[in-house]
From Swiss-Prot:
Quaternary data: Associated with the spliceosome.
Family to which this protein belongs: Belongs to the CWC26 family.
GO biological process: mRNA splicing, via spliceosome
Annotated region (Disordered), positions in chain: 12-100, 157-199, 206-225, 281-314
Gene Ontology MF terms: RNA binding
Organism: Pyricularia oryzae (strain 70-15 / ATCC MYA-4617 / FGSC 8958) (Rice blast fungus)
Keywords tagged on the record: Coiled coil, Cytoplasm, mRNA processing, mRNA splicing, Nucleus, Spliceosome
Biased amino acid composition, Basic residues: 21-30
UniProt biased composition (Basic and acidic residues): 160-177
Function statement: Involved in pre-mRNA splicing.
Principal location listed in the UniProt entry: cytoplasm
Protein's name in the database: Pre-mRNA-splicing factor CWC26
Length: 352
């Protein structure tokens, strides 16, 4: 019985101590205790004491504090002022009241969240997400309007270039498919050029003509650097190559062309050369003096050599060193000096 009485009193008459007020200095234990879920007030004997009664200053502070308090007072105070009925039932009413308060709080939170979402939708203050379905304002170069970072602008420009390239490839493929060219690059459209009269200009033909003219100019410049002998030899080689196309594959001893070519070739050690006359040599295709060779066909020195009074050329094995005493050179100097003096004397006589 005592345990049941203690639990009954705790459930129906005892409440937790409220938090102390910062503006009123009271004792930690209030004289009045409000039972949760009931309207009965328990008053101590010392409540009538003067030191426990609040002063006018404390009352004003309480009014200001109540005015500054956010809407909604404690459940204990509302129940204490609205109802003074005493509940005689068990402790199930406390749990029911707590459930009702939790449901009311959840309803308030849900309504506040709904109002906040509606306000965001109405004021359009939702954050902008890159790549979202909301279309952002873009400029002509493909970048978004407004303040952007360098990396964002570079990525937007790269994306714009990729889109333009893909669009160009699609249009190019469509044009090829329309012309029936497939993937052949030769089906590309060419730029048409026209003159002042409207006549079409064949750019390919003009380029070919310019290329040929340039090649002809270069060939003429190379030909100008060659001598007559080189030009003649080149002509003979071309003729020989042209004749080789009609030449039979097998050539024997009766081939006149080959026999004439072998007879016309001159050799310095040919013993028959000294018995041939000038006419025979010319008929054979040679000359009296060809390539620094004498009529007899013996080799001679082809380099420069000092003149002598007999007109004898040095041997073909001479190394170019003059090993004489210099008489021939002094002789020619004396002859030249005498001729020059003679000319000067004649000119002086004419002046007088």
């Amino acid at each position: 019985m005592p345990s049941d009485l203690a639990s009954y009193l705790a459930d129906h008459y005892l409440t937790a101590d409220p938090k102390p007020s910062k503006k009123r200095k009271r004792k930690h234990g209030d004289s009045k205790k409000i039972k949760e879920g009931a309207g009965l007030l328990i008053q101590d004997d010392d409540d009538d004491a003067a030191w426990t009664k609040p002063s006018s200053r404390d009352a004003d502070a309480d009014e200001l504090s109540a005015a500054a308090t956010i809407a909604g007072t404690s459940a204990e105070f509302r129940r204490a002022t609205k109802s003074s009925w005493k509940t005689l039932g068990g402790g199930g009413s406390s749990k029911t009241n707590t459930d009702h308060e939790a449901a009311a709080a959840d309803a308030i939170l849900a309504s506040a969240a709904a109002e906040s979402a509606a306000a965001r939708d109405a004021e359009d203050d939702a954050p902008v997400v890159e790549g979202a379905s909301v279309a952002a304002v873009k400029m002509s170069d493909g970048t978004h309007a407004g303040l952007q970072t360098a990396a964002t602008v570079a990525a937007q420009l790269q994306r714009r270039r990729a889109e333009e390239k893909a669009q160009y490839e699609r249009e190019r493929a469509e044009r090829r498919a329309a012309r029936g060219g497939g993937g052949d690059s030769s089906g590309e459209e060419e730029t048409v050029f026209r003159d002042a009269t409207g006549r079409r200009i064949d750019v390919t033909l003009q380029r070919e003509q310019k290329r040929k003219a340039e090649a002809e100019k270069q060939r003429a410049a190379k030909e100008a650097l060659k001598g007559e002998v080189q030009i003649e030899e080149a002509r003979r080689r071309r003729e020989k190559l042209e004749d080789a196309a009609l030449m039979p594959l097998a050539r024997g001893k009766d081939d006149e062309e080959m026999n004439n070519a072998m007879k016309s070739e001159q050799r310095w050690n040919d013993p028959m050369m000294q018995f041939m006359s000038e006419n025979d040599k010319r008929e054979a295709g040679g000359t009296a003096k060809t390539g620094g060779r004498r009529v007899k066909g013996r080799p001679v020195y082809k380099g420069p050599a000092a003149p002598n009074r007999y007109g004898i050329r040095p041997g073909y094995r001479w190394d170019g060193v003059d090993r004489g005493i210099g008489f021939e050179a002094e002789r020619f100097k004396a002859l030249n000096r005498r001729e020059r003096t003679k000319d000067l004397e004649y000119n002086w006589q004419m002046d007088e």
